[in-house]
Amino acid sequence: MRIDALALRNFRNYDALNVTFAPDCNVIVGENAQGKTNLLEAIVYLSSAHSPRTRADRELISFGKNEAKLTAQAFARSRDFLLEVSLAAGKRRKIFINKVPAKKGSDLTDVLGAVYFCPEDLLLIRDGAAARRRFMDDALCQLRARYAQALSDYHRAYEHKTRILRDSEEYPSLLDTLPEFDLRMAQSGAVLIYYRARFCERLGEYARTAHRECSGGREELGVTYQTVSTISDPLAPIETI
């Protein structure tokens, strides 16, 4: 797969950008704070419908603007694709693949895959659990469509629950709907826990082999996934978590 061209409008620091890429390796150079990372962020967003730097799509829209658009011409699976994402403040984003509305953001991953590396990756070790969850979310949303859907469902239920708790003092009857959203969060959360545990298990296998080679066989590296204390076995079937 490859990206042949990219167009941005009102995305981060770009009022308008149109760029074409070589079919092989491309090197992006420039002064600091000129938008190199923003360009890479746009490519990642077009491959996953998620930014590796923020969870709020509003932050991707240029300051003082109300909407943004990302467009890419890509080649994958022996055919051409046109990927389009429109962002608008206070509205749901719109995603089109070859002018056809996408049912979900993970449909982009079926066309374009991207791996994003940055200096902040060191925060996986130095920072708290939130950075590690974000890393797994970004990877698994591209690898497993079911995970991407579960993550979206979880956040949606969480936002509903937050609004209910916020407004319950004025409208106490809203509290009657809390169990429904608790159930939705539990169901989606079970899917997230299962896939994260499997991801860490596979990652540990590769990391163990690589570290053994780097240390000349003198050291062993292990990766384990620890979730909430009420989950005794995160690798158990989803229905039992």
Predicted regions and their residues:
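Pre-Walker A-like glycine/lysine-rich segment at the N-terminus of P-loop NTPase domains
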Residues: 1-45
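Phosphate-binding site recognition
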Residues: 15-16, 20-21, 44, 53-61, ...
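Short beta-strand segments
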Residues: 15-19, 79-83, 221
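Nucleotide-state sensing region of NTPase/ATPase domains
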Residues: 48-131, 137-147, 204-209
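Short loop/turn motifs enriched for small/polar and acidic residues
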Residues: 88, 224-228
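An accessory alpha-helical subdomain
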Residues: 123-217, 227-228
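Small-residue-rich helix-loop
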Residues: 227-241
